[in-house]
Amino acid sequence: MFKQYLQVTKPGIIFGNLISVIGGFLLASKGSIDYTLFASTLVGVSLVVASGCVFNNYIDMDIDRKMERTKNRVLVKGLISPTVSLVYATLLGIAGFMLLWFGANPLACWLGVMGFVVYVGVYSLYMKRHSVYGTLIGSLSGAAPPVIGYCAVTNEFDSGALILLAIFSLWQMPHSYAIAIFRFKDYQAANIPVLPVVKGISVAKNHITLYIIAFAVATLMLSLGGYAGYKYLVVAAAVSVWWLGMALRGYKVEDDKVWARKLFVFSIVAITSLSVMMSVDFMVPDSHSLLTYVW
């Protein structure tokens, strides 16, 4: 029973988000870690992400039945009733938001709310099924965790938070399009209007290349803005160039699925590397950003 309730929260997604939360939190902490705040932020974000994933599983039951990758999910197989899953998701969300509000700060909580609403209310309920731009909208919610981690420490949305939002949003696009390419038939069978299905794989490759270039620029801004050091800069440049090279090789490959899977795997390596480096190679900016909102 416990295993089923764990599976429906998509623990892999939770773990991936925790890595980015830690990156944002430690970047902002700059070596001075409040461990109570750290724990509250990690657990709070985990609960909110878990809640969003359970709601997503509920909303996507009809789609999941049509896809090879998702046809054995807990709700599709009836291992947990839909009603129970809604109660479970609601309780997880309430607990997560309360922990962020009282354990971190209201700004961190509101960022969590915004990410949650975009993911569940905008992306899952509508955009995923009706628009080729669903991935773009969903990328904003996927970028929320590191920003929450950062703002849990700073209690302000400054240029550092904005750069993190840009980095992780831009990363989501080639990452997601790569999945859509090597899972092309699944998305086609479920009639999900992702870019590779609607516009074709060639167009998707162009978008992947452009987004990786934009991602590379955004990653450098963290050092140029005085938030991360030269070691981070070297790693960011290296992974960006390598990832871009992989994308460009996609124009000459014979098997798009194999190429897309490799691109997807490296995307995880890339974002994990950046999260680790921003955690350990931080700097104190010389001045505050012009874009600052203080609670």
Swiss-Prot record:
GO molecular function: protoheme IX farnesyltransferase activity
Gene Ontology annotations of biological process type: heme O biosynthetic process
GO cellular component terms, semicolon-separated: plasma membrane
Chief place where the protein resides: membrane
Keyword Cell inner membrane: yes
Cellular location(s): Cell inner membrane
Keywords associated with the record: Cell inner membrane, Cell membrane, Heme biosynthesis, Membrane, Transferase, Transmembrane, Transmembrane helix
Its membrane topology: Multi-pass membrane protein
Gene3D superfamilies: UbiA prenyltransferase
Additional comment: Carbon 2 of the heme B porphyrin ring is defined according to the Fischer nomenclature.
Family: Belongs to the UbiA prenyltransferase family. Protoheme IX farnesyltransferase subfamily.
Function field: Converts heme B (protoheme IX) to heme O by substitution of the vinyl group on carbon 2 of heme B porphyrin ring with a hydroxyethyl farnesyl side group.
Protein name, as recorded: Protoheme IX farnesyltransferase
Protein species of origin: Enterobacter sp. (strain 638)
Taxon lineage: Bacteria, Pseudomonadati, Pseudomonadota, Gammaproteobacteria, Enterobacterales
Gene that specifies this protein: cyoE
